[in-house]
Amino acid sequence: METIVLATSNTNKVEEFNQLFTTSAATIVSARAYGGMPAVEETGRTFQANAYLKAAALSQKLKKSHWVLSDDSGLEVDFLKGAPGIFSARYAGAQASDEENVEKLIDALKGLPKRQRRARFRCV
């Protein structure tokens, strides 16, 4: 059976990917199984670029001995012209919690009628 290492330490993501691959002969494991993710500065300007940075960093750490899969995701709000987008996890600051990011987003949408609060979650 083939093992694919997911470039994340998020156990929920590993479970989600394993559900997607139920008919596959591959098993998805977290980077934690190999000592965790190396530090990756997400400097890409797109979700695809940041996903590539994560996959490349983990692949290099594993010395290209395993298949590596990565993703990047975020919330795109129409009124905010696609923001927070690639900055969703650090929208309220580099060390911000999920709650702080949500609070900043709610503040940014204050006064906007609910029918105009359109957004999408993008994952690549």
PLM region spans:
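Anionic-ligand binding patches
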Residues: E2-V5, T11-V124
